[in-house]
Amino acid sequence: MSEQPAPAPVPVLPAEVADALKRDAAGLVAAVVQQFDTNEVLMLGWMDDEALRRTMTSGRVTFYSRSRQEYWRKGDTSGHVQWVKSVALDCDGDALLVRVDQVGAACHTGTRTCFDGRGLPVVAGDAGAAGNAS
């Protein structure tokens, strides 16, 4: 009887990354996606540890779909690929900033960004007036 080779280890996030993440009750972290050279905010997606690992190691962004309960790699169907330039964790560990080179539309509606045309009415502040407040 011949020996079977040991199964390949299941890849995981580096411990220092996994330990720093503060996940929601579903094990997910918000991922803000930004165009690397213009700083344009493109979209918000969700990642679990495996989606983040895939994003950090493949050069392409992978999200976890909350509605479909499955992984999806941006651009596999549409061709609108997000090429990873950097990933950063915020100070609280509960959000990621994924800087990308976006090919085509980022939004499933076909627009460049998911934040087109739905601005809300606000009272705009003035940073110059902050020193005048009493």
UniProtKB/Swiss-Prot annotation:
UniProt-listed Enzyme Commission number(s): 3.5.4.19
Compartments, as annotated in UniProt: Cytoplasm
Residues involved in Zn(2+) binding: 91, 107, 114
Signal peptide interval: none
Entry keywords, A to Z: Amino-acid biosynthesis, Cytoplasm, Histidine biosynthesis, Hydrolase, Magnesium, Metal-binding, Zinc
Gene3D superfamilies on file: Phosphoribosyl-AMP cyclohydrolase (3.10.20.810)
Gene Ontology MF term list: magnesium ion binding; phosphoribosyl-AMP cyclohydrolase activity; zinc ion binding
A Pfam family per the record: PRA-CH
Reaction(s) catalysed by this chain's protein: 1-(5-phospho-beta-D-ribosyl)-5'-AMP + H2O = 1-(5-phospho-beta-D-ribosyl)-5-[(5-phospho-beta-D-ribosylamino)methylideneamino]imidazole-4-carboxamide
GO cellular component: cytoplasm
Xref: HAMAP family: HisI
PANTHER family on file: HISTIDINE BIOSYNTHESIS BIFUNCTIONAL PROTEIN, PHOSPHORIBOSYL-AMP CYCLOHYDROLASE
NCBIfam families from the UniProt entry: PRK00051.1 (NF000768)
Family affiliation: Belongs to the PRA-CH family.
Subunit note: Homodimer.
Role played: Catalyzes the hydrolysis of the adenine ring of phosphoribosyl-AMP.
Name under which the protein is recorded: Phosphoribosyl-AMP cyclohydrolase
Organism: Arthrobacter sp. (strain FB24)
Primary gene name: hisI
